[in-house]
Amino acid sequence: AYGVVYKARDIETNEDIALKKIRLEQEDEGVPSTAIREISLLKEMHHENIVNLKDVVHREKRLYLVFEYLDLDLKKHMDSCPEFSQDLHMVKMFLCQILRGVAYCHSHRVLHRDLKPQNLLIDRGSNTIKLADFGLARAFGIPVRTFTHEVVTLWYRAPEVLLGSRHYSTPVDVWSVGCIFAEMVNQKPLFPGDSEIDELHKIFRIIGTPNEDIWPGVTSLPDFKSSFPKWPPKELATIVPNLGATGLDLLCKMLQLDPSKRITAKKALEHEYFKDIVLP
C-alpha cells in the first residue's frame, strides 16, 4: 500500500531482496524525520515470524526499505490451495506463528494496524509464516488507497477503529488475527464489508450490536450511532462450523467487541487450542 515493491538482488551476498520504495504524500518536503526514526527502530526487531527489515536507504527525498524476499502470501496460498482449510493442523501452526510474531511486536510496543492475509508472507521451504509491513502504519499512516488505487481493505479492521476511537492499541491486531483465523478455516472472509458502515453491520450481525453493558464507553465513540440495528449475537459454531470447541473458544476471545476484554496475543499462545503444537 505504501509504494512500489521491486524484486532486487543484493550484489554482495547474491540474495534476492524486496525493495520497497515509499511514496510520500509531501513529495517535495522529503522524508519526515519522525518516519525515519520509526523505521530505524524496526531494524532492531528480529523474530523468525517477522519479515526482516535489512536496511533503510534514504536517497533524493525518497525512502527505500530493504526486506528479505518472499514471493508467497497467505491470500495467494488460500486462493491456490482450497484444500488448505481442511488441514486444521496446518491452520493451527500458521495461527500460532502469526500470534508469535504479533506478540513479539507488541512486547516492543509496535502495532501493525493493517494485518491481512496479503501481508502474511510464507517461506515455502520451511512453511514459516512471517508478518510484513509491521510498524509502517505509524511511520507513514494507513493510506486510503493502495499505490495501484485499490481501496485498502476494511475486512480485518477492529470495531473500535471503525467507530472512530483515537485511543486504540494492541487489541486492534488481535481482532485482525481473529478474522484471519476464521478465514483460514472457512476459506472465505468473515466480515467482507465494502464501506465502513457495511463493515460494522457485517460485524454486528454476527457478533451482536454492542451497547454500554457489553462494551462500556462504546456509545461515546465518535462514529457510534444509536440508530444501529440491534442484532443479537450468533453462535460462532454456526459461522465457523469446521472449527472444534477449543478453536471456537479462542476465536470468541479474539473477536470480543470491547478491546479491553479481547485476549492478548501472548495469552492466546497459552490457550488450550495450542497444547498439541510443538514449535522450535
From Swiss-Prot:
EC number: 2.7.11.22, 2.7.11.23
Keywords, comma-separated and alphabetical: ATP-binding, Cell cycle, Cell division, Kinase, Mitosis, Nucleotide-binding, Phosphoprotein, Serine/threonine-protein kinase, Transferase
The keyword Metal-binding belongs to this UniProt entry's keyword annotation: no
Activity regulation comment: Phosphorylation at Tyr-2 inactivates the enzyme, while phosphorylation at Thr-148 activates it.
SMART domains: S_TKc
One function term, GO molecular function aspect: ATP binding
Modified residue annotations for Phosphothreonine: T148
InterPro entries assigned: CDK, Kinase-like_dom_sf, Prot_kinase_dom, Ser/Thr_kinase_AS
Catalytic reactions on record: L-seryl-[protein] + ATP = O-phospho-L-seryl-[protein] + ADP + H(+); L-threonyl-[protein] + ATP = O-phospho-L-threonyl-[protein] + ADP + H(+); [DNA-directed RNA polymerase] + ATP = phospho-[DNA-directed RNA polymerase] + ADP + H(+)
Family the UniProt entry places it in: Belongs to the protein kinase superfamily. CMGC Ser/Thr protein kinase family. CDC2/CDKX subfamily.
Name of the protein in question: Cell division control protein 2 homolog B
Gene source species: Antirrhinum majus (Garden snapdragon)
